[in-house]
Amino acid sequence: MASLSPALYHGLDHLGAIAPGYQADVLLLPDLVSFVPDVVLSAGAPVEEIPHVQVPEWVKRTMRLDLVTSDGFRVPWRGGQARVIGLIPGEIVTASLVDELGLEDGYAVADPARDLAKVAVLERHLGTGRIGLGFVRGFGIQRGAFGATLSHDAHNVVVVGVDDDAMVLVVERLRELGGGIVVADEDDVRAELPLPVAGLLSDRPLGEVLDASRGINGAAQALGVTFPAPFQMLAFLALSVIPSLKITDRGLLDVDRCELVPLTLDEFVELQPSRPATPVSATHA
């Protein structure tokens, strides 16, 4: 059913089953543990050798992102009510919440005691330097930060944290890797899953990817993250076609109204929904 159900759903009536009239895409396995096939059939023809995919070098150079400092994640604030992205367990839709933000030295800050984390989206394809900033509730993160380049649909960098310096470390490590998923705490990268192919795919064997996946999930839990499948949720925070409140590199988006909205709900506070990064080096091509 794992192969038949999606084939039926997408109307691919010739795929998904081993039966007369179906395309013979078949793996013959010696057991259900190792999953190393003895025979591979593609459209009925035996495959003697699985060809190695040659990835063009330009596909591995998609992080057109300047270095940022913690200043790039500062949110000027005078107090008042703010829009907050609210996570819903088991859903990729988000709620549009209203809450008071913590205030330090004229800047809005994360408040892990109230499960309020900062979220940032950094444009990474064109080198524009745009950063959209906001706040999110529901991950449960108590320290550090985590982020990824797997972020539907634009696949910009998205990072969540309660420590601006840790957020900077996550972004810098993602830039060095050429994309992926990174978890950091204080001044240390705790776990990472490199995705160097367009920042979306791994070029490593499945076993290595599985080990790295377990590592990033364990590291996220060590930061206090309680939301189930946090990296899957992270990948949908910037999906600007799914209700209700999302974050993009241009700022917060009210999907229901289909318009960018400021973080603040108070008219007397002037705050841009997004602003350029603070560059300290040339664009990384």
Predicted stretch roles:
Residues 2-285:
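Active-site microenvironment of metallo-dependent hydrolases
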